[in-house]
Amino acid sequence: MRIVFDVTPLSHPRTGVGNYIRGSLAGLAEVAAGKHEIVAWAPTSAAGARHVLEALDGIPVERRIVRFPFAHAWRTIWSRAGHLPAERFIRPFDVLHFSDWMFPPQRSGVRSTMIHDLVPLRFPEWTTPRTRSMHAAKYRNAARTCDLLFVNSRYTGRETEELLGVSADRIRVAYPGVEPRFRPEGDRADLGRSYAVTVATLEPRKNLDTLLAAHRLDPHGLALAVVGWPGWGPQPDLGGEDVIPLGFVANDELPRYYRGAEVLVVPSRFEGFGMTVVEGMACGVPCVVSSHPSLDEACGDAAVRVDPDDPEAIAAGIGEALARRDELRALGFEHARGFTWGACGATMLEAFEAAA
């Protein structure tokens, strides 16, 4: 079986979606080795191709990187127009799995996609008009044409049924995995003092303003390290006392900041899954996490849960996590062991084989 796997989002420095795409492809390649042909495909720019090839390093798959000028505009027009099937650009395939933003037309074979979350439909006020428009088009196309829709949590699966009207038999839950670099052993970041850390794109949904308010109430003397680069919308004021803005941190460096922290705080109002929670647990840091049910599967019973809109509750949660440090580290580490990219790849391959 020939499986074409769209990796176009790897054209940019990796954040959550890119990490999922790379990890799920690596897991698929692992379980399909010797049985099926896996092709990583990306119609992208010359600069994007460099990012893609760097991200694919170490994954044993065929690379089919097609370079276009004005690649983003081309992909958007191609997806919306629905002409020129993907077979015009890549050899015939049995499965086409596309990831995010692009939804290429195809002539034959199993059609598969990934739904990371439905924020543009559920909470349109937390997205840009461009994001709402493109994702709404992708969602409609996926609901109408896809044989398989993978989701990263049961929560997102229920949302997909409810908001897109997709029957449960077309939906598969493929949980993300934890890369081996996220482990308790290894270097720790030294920021000159004890700190709490949060890892998030700086945008309204991530709720950094409430976390900053909680930080001002925190009686434990921790600095607040903020990892993440600006997203859209009003930006939080990171110039306060004992706030350490770190900007974008590459994936290879991120475990150091988890390991060095006294606590990881994830105050997000909504997530498709919440991978930063599991990464932090795998590195042995106690976690304080929003009580929104979209984060339940990432947390299990291994985190302190708090009202994301209550600064006092977040501050109290940090105190509880510090008091229960050893217990939460043990619970979190055990919980994180249940998330592997091999298991994610096995879920995908089983579905592809059944549908082909």
What are these regions, as identified by a protein language model?
Residues 1-356:
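Carbohydrate transferase catalytic cores enriched for Leloir-type hexosyltransferases
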